[in-house]
């Protein structure tokens, strides 16, 4: 039995929109679905509500069937630390309220939540069912919030705080292929901030291709929305 191949891009804003679009076109040609991780704020000084081009781009992608996943409130709010990695339930609840309200005003309402860098505190996981989320995704795996079911499948990342050095990329390519050969679900993600480096992009596509060739079935995270 084959697992899924889940590909995603994060850190999508004015500086990375063009590069994100280029990668999407390449993966679309290979019929690889890609989920987009989006947030209302990035780095404290970029705001989706004030960026008409990125807003329009995301709406076009969603209208075309692309899955958008809420990726926090402000990715850099705690400097180098991931936003939802250490929050208690009260703080997580406040940030989720802010993020969901602001995204709803812009016309986006996602059923899936993935914290920045995929790092999710127990307090965050505790309060997510209070919102309209059906699925949450962390470094460890995929949580079905209504049933409580958990699918253990670690994320393999280029960037997003995990690095994108050549040795790291080689390890990710091998890990993706091995995992697919075992019939496991393979999760591959890349930060939009790393898409300027053509070698990084090439190796990311190689990891996707190796996993698909080894039997992982391309899908987006929405496949878990039907398993409630």
Where are the predicted features?
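Catalytic domains of cell-wall/extracellular-matrix polysaccharide-remodeling enzymes
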Residues: 87-158, 196-202
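Active-site beta->alpha N-cap acidic-glycine motif
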Residues: 1-64, 201
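Alpha-helical scaffolding within the catalytic cores
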Residues: 17-23, 49-61, 138-148, 164-178
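Metal-dependent polysaccharide deacetylase catalytic core of the NodB/CE4 family, i.e.
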Residues: 33, 37-123, 185-192
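Glycan-processing catalytic domains of CAZymes
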Residues: 8, 19, 69-71, 132-136, ...
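C-terminal domain-boundary segment and adjacent tail
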Residues: 1, 34-35, 60, 190-228
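Acidic-and-aromatic substrate-binding clefts and catalytic sites of carbohydrate-active enzymes
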Residues: 11-19, 39-54, 114-123, 161-169, ...
